[in-house]
From Swiss-Prot:
Residue ranges of the TM segments: 15-35, 68-88
Protein task: Part of the complex catalyzing the transfer of N-acetylglucosamine from UDP-N-acetylglucosamine to phosphatidylinositol, the first step of GPI biosynthesis. Involved in cell wall biosynthesis.
Protein name in UniProt: Phosphatidylinositol N-acetylglucosaminyltransferase subunit GPI19
Ranges facing Lumenal side: 36-67
Gene Ontology CC terms, in alphabetical order: endoplasmic reticulum; glycosylphosphatidylinositol-N-acetylglucosaminyltransferase (GPI-GnT) complex
Enzyme class (EC, first level): transferase
Metabolic or biological pathway: Glycolipid biosynthesis; glycosylphosphatidylinositol-anchor biosynthesis
Keyword Membrane in record: yes
Topology versus the membrane: Multi-pass membrane protein
Domain of life: Eukaryota
Subunit details: Component of the phosphatidylinositol N-acetylglucosaminyltransferase complex.
Keywords, in A-Z order: Cell wall biogenesis/degradation, Endoplasmic reticulum, GPI-anchor biosynthesis, Membrane, Transferase, Transmembrane, Transmembrane helix
Length: 153
């Protein structure tokens, strides 16, 4: 039941937004007034004149066209700020430096501070809550590219 309600509300929203967009485009592109000022004062003779008179009166209810351009420009600038300004702000201000310890751990972590490798093995390596420890590059290289790996190939 909840899924159907979401489908219907999404459909109604998309149709409503499309109608508003079409109305805005027509409002900005239609000439105003549709009828000459002399013909507006007279009684409409044809159906097209009466429709044009109705549309002229309908357009008078809307704000001036200047405001639709201003609103569209403000929306565009807001989009530029969101798409460009916020990621730059996040990258330059909110992101910690790469050499900061907060990039690899948080306040709940158990950071290893050992004097020797043997002390690390006895204190942290085989316990349930191992500490955060940077592996030496020599051990990583030996494990990945050592002689034992080449013999198995």
């Amino acid at each position: 039941m909840k899924q159907d309600k979401r489908k219907y509300s999404g459909f109604v929203q998309s149709v409503g937004i499309t109608c508003v967009l079409i109305l805005i485009i027509l409002w900005t592109l239609l000439p105003y007034p549709l009828l000459d000022p002399e013909k507006r004062l007279a009684e409409p003779q044809t159906t097209t004149e009466s429709i044009s008179l109705f549309l002229d009166e309908l357009v008078e209810l809307f704000p001036q066209r200047y405001w639709i351009i201003c609103i569209q420009c403000m929306i565009l600038m807001d989009m530029l700020f969101v798409y460009i300004g916020l990621p730059i702000f996040n990258q330059s201000v909110l992101t910690v430096r790469l050499d900061d310890l907060r990039t690899i751990t948080d306040s709940k972590a158990s950071v290893v501070m050992c004097e020797s490798h043997a002390e690390f093995l006895t204190s942290y390596a085989h316990t349930e809550t191992s500490g955060v420890y940077d592996l030496p590059i020599t051990e990583v290289s030996r494990l990945l590219y050592g002689k034992a790996r080449h013999k198995s190939d």
